[in-house]
């Protein structure tokens, strides 16, 4: 007499979610590579972009005390269990996905409050292409921690087109924004911090560095550095 076996069905829904996300990220990067020359030429047709600086911005001391408050269209959140103070634009300008591209700004530990004072007008600007950023609460980190000696600012970049792509205009604005951050810090003679081993930067960037967090890790390596330098987004920022 045949034995009836229970009908077992493996639920692959959770696996399918993970698998479906990976090709999407890879295809987004491939599309950016394929469109590199077109975007490169389009970016160079735009004139210099001038960002309206936000006024009446909070000080570093202010945001270290806030728990949750809206300021200049950004929700600032400072939880006691987190070493970072988070800022997120209530109505994002870029409606696309985050595909891993981000910038760090590294400042000498003792000058982080002053650096924030110098950059806050741009970070809170209505013209800023960055909808989400965070800064280290220096009161909550050890002196030699990774985000204490550098990488105190993190700027997250979101795409603005379908299929997680960037428009030439957004790329141009981001390039110009990074240049403004760099020049403001340099003009104010802020001492740079130790930029992360996980990141890359060109020689003329003294404070800002780049990393794609979906295709790299925090430890860094020669292979990772080479890979990041070949990222189409990074190349469109520096070439």
Swiss-Prot record:
Family: Belongs to the phosphothreonine lyase family.
Function summary: Catalyzes the removal of the phosphate group from the phosphothreonine in the mitogen-activated protein kinases p38, phosphothreonine in the mitogen-activated protein kinases such as MAPK2/ERK2, MAPK3/ERK1, MAPK8 and MAPK14 in an irreversible reaction, thus preventing the downstream phosphorylation of histone H3. This epigenetic modification results in inhibition of the transcription of a specific subset of pro-inflammatory genes, and ultimately to a reduced immune response against the invading pathogen.
GO molecular function, one term: lyase activity
Domain of life assignment: Bacteria
GO cellular component: extracellular region
Pfam families linked: VRP3
Protein name according to UniProt: Phosphothreonine lyase OspF
InterPro entries linked: OspF/SpvC (IPR003519), OspF/SpvC_sf (IPR038498)
Keyword annotations: Lyase, Plasmid, Secreted, Virulence
Location, primary (coarse class): secreted
EC number(s) given by UniProt: 4.2.3.-
Active site location: 104, 134
KW Secreted (keyword) present: yes
Compartments, record wording: Secreted
